[in-house]
């Protein structure tokens, strides 16, 4: 089975927010999250609940629970067969806050817009 590419979203300054979020986690939690990312690369969009779930449209969440804390990474698959990791966060409740969804949507749009070919000008 061919592995899927998994990439960290980069903002306009070249910052990788999910990578920065991972750096702030304990070694134990980071290892578990990285293992889950590897599972996503292995299975691609076929990886489903309880490991991932759909948020809305193409936006999905990678799910991991460690102790009482839920860790999430919002991501989507772009047209080049790459999983793009958009936003990482932890939470204590079962729902994803609208503010986190908004960040995920904005970063997904920014990624798609950056990758879209420039429109040819009419002469």
Language-model segments: which ranges?
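Basic, Lys/Arg-enriched alpha-helical interface segments
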Residues: 1-70, 79-83, 90-123
